Amino acid sequence: NDLKKILVNKKIGKIYHCKIFYGNGTSRLVKKSKWRDKGKGVITDIGSHLIDLCLYWFGKDFKNINIIASNKFENNSPDHAIIKFNIKNIFIEIEMSLCMWKNTFRCDVIGSKGSAHLNSLCKWGKNFFELRERKLPSGQPKRKVFKKYSLKDPTWKLENLYLKKLIKKRYFGNLKNDLIINSFFKKI
């Protein structure tokens, strides 16, 4: 949410590129699953979440989608992949892995006036969100760390409350983003 506000308010200027890495160590669990170790593997498993983030932050105009790497280190389906694409002239690279022995999430968004950096998720230990203001013509940027904390995973509780609220309102969903994500995967 903090990153979305920074992007909307153009705090880091014109966005040049974004790099996201998301990895966990579930390759052996996936290998034991008949339905998970099939098809595009980690690309549709973890990749769907990364594409959803890109939709939220940058929009849906996906162009020039290319798989840079697709590896089957321990599984029958890909357990590591790197994909690059563009949204609104922003170069985006996403990397996903089931062979990362400590759960890891990193995101770097680089713009003309600075950059924004996310490191980890609170459920996996200390995390932070950092904003760097570009120094011209060059030099060490002015840094501001917004959040640095470690919590138990709050997402399940929040998702459960959100789901109950939707049920009370009799709202049964919108598949628009799911269809966009599905069309992304059909292009690779």
Name every feature range the model reports, one short phrase each.
Residues 142-152:
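C-terminal "lid/loop" region of Rossmann-like NAD(P)-dependent oxidoreductases
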Residues 51-125, 155-170:
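Contiguous beta-strand/loop segments that form the cofactor/metal-binding neighborhood of enzyme cores
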Residues 10, 132-134, 165-170:
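Short loop/turn hinge sites at secondary-structure boundaries
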